[in-house]
Amino acid sequence: MKLNTLAPAAGSKSAPKRLGRGIGSGLGKTSGKGHKGQKARSGGYHKVGFEGGQMPLQRRLPKFGFTSASKGYVAEIRLHELNNVVADEVTLDTLKDFGLIRKDIKTVKVIASGEIQKAVSLKGIACTKGAKEAIEKAGGKVE
């Protein structure tokens, strides 16, 4: 068996019905489109969501919510992830260097999840109340 000899089993695949090729084909003359009307014409169909002039569903329902402009630029870091940083002073750039956050992140917040085993000094990084207590308990500080 070779790749160029692979073929489906005989009779397993049937050719698609060809439209408009005589009445004997079963889909001749109008090619399954019926008689006249918009849907029988070439290029004739309504846009997605069109309900024949009735107010469409997406316009009947109220708008809600908004897209936050800062969503993509804020990151959260767990407390135990700070153990991977081999530096006494942790800044935004330090976290980027160690691959803990993406390069385009502008603000970071440390959350109290897990434990921290070493003393670190946070500079220019926000943290929760629980995370601050844990960092100070381990001998670090938050600036």
Curated annotation (Swiss-Prot):
Identification of the protein by name: Large ribosomal subunit protein uL15
Q: Which organism is it from?
A: Francisella tularensis subsp. tularensis (strain SCHU S4 / Schu 4)
Q: Which InterPro entries match?
A: Ribosomal_uL15, Ribosomal_uL15/eL18, Ribosomal_uL15/eL18_sf, Ribosomal_uL15_bac-type, Ribosomal_uL15_CS
Q: Which NCBIfam families is this protein grouped with?
A: rplO_bact (TIGR01071)
Q: Name one Pfam family in it.
A: Ribosomal_L27A
Q: Its function?
A: Binds to the 23S rRNA.
Q: Per the record, what is one GO cellular component?
A: cytosolic large ribosomal subunit
Q: Which GO terms describe its molecular function?
A: rRNA binding; structural constituent of ribosome
Q: Which UniProt keywords apply?
A: Ribonucleoprotein, Ribosomal protein, RNA-binding, rRNA-binding
Q: Which Gene3D superfamilies match?
A: 3.100.10.10
Give the compositionally biased regions (Gly residues). Answer: 21-31
* GO BP annotations, alphabetical order: translation
Segments carrying the region annotation (Disordered) are 1-52
What subunit structure does UniProt give? Part of the 50S ribosomal subunit.
Q: Which family does it belong to?
A: Belongs to the universal ribosomal protein uL15 family.
Gene this chain is encoded by: rplO
